[in-house]
Amino acid sequence: MAEFNAMDTAAFKGVWVFCEQREGEIQSISYQLLSEGRKLANDLGVELCGVVMGSELNEDYVKALGGYGADRVYNIDSPLLKDYTTDGYAKALCDLIMDKKPEIMLIGATNLGRDLGPRCAARLHTGLTADCTHLDVDVEKYKNFLRTTSNIDVDNTKFEENTNLKMTRPAFGGHLMATIICPRFRPQMSTVRPGVMQMQAFDQAGADKVVIENVAPALTADDIHVQVLDIKKSAEKLVDLIGADVVVAVGRGISADPDKGIKLAEELAEALGGVVGASRAVTDEGWLSADHQVGQTGKTVHPRIYVALGISGAIQHVAGMQDSENIIAINKNENAPIFDVATYGIVGDLYKVVPELIKEIKAAKA
């Protein structure tokens, strides 16, 4: 077990990203976090390192992490890390952290990351902020963020000048946003949901020059108390909102006839080659499962086209889709806040408008 007090924090330098892989393939959340980590590392003037774990991973996959911003990649390789176990991964990662002492550690808020992050934070006796939607180390950039996302009188508020990681996340069911710091302990740890951070374009020059350090962990079978016997993929296919080019989302406006509203959304999504999303109101009612939810407490998406059907535009929902390239809003309330972020707006009854849209799209394709 390790414990670092305030006197030790100056010894910690660098931004690290845990790069998750499944069956040898690097997950997109890793590239998103490296892109965000690159910004933080630039602001701090430090190195950005990726950490990947597994057994005999493809060297090209490891080098590709440099193409998304990593200066250095620690490749922790062991047959005992072939399959994820909390004990094995936590020990290997914590041992490396205690040796190299990074000041920031970013982990994806995936099922794996939500298990690994808290275990590592507990071992290291440091803090972890979960499900972050915004990260800053530069005070001026943080002030600009507050100016655009809050009603705080930034210019008349005193801010402490430091480079602590300012970790912003939804609180109280998404009704508030809280910024959390960890000033006395290191590393400062944060988990970030997939789709929240923008992934930069791949840079081959970065991949060519990245430094790869192969690490043989001090790990034995006795360190791992759970044995993975078999891995079975879920029979249920979850909707891929984050990777979708088109999202057709439904809100409380379908309450008059939820089944019909969802059916129309599915037909429109099929016509456009997209998938169906939902506001929290829809998933709370059980009309669609939680994997369809878009927003602060759901998924953050950046599709080419986002169609909002009967969605009023609560700030919690808008936070999860406002960076879509084109937003088409259909709502019978002309004062609905969703029109403030919409590229195109249609004031009308979705049950009348959507069938006409579907008909026109199909005719155009014929």
Regions of interest found by a model, annotated:
Residues 1-366:
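N-terminal glycine-rich FAD/FM-binding segment characteristic of electron-transfer flavoproteins
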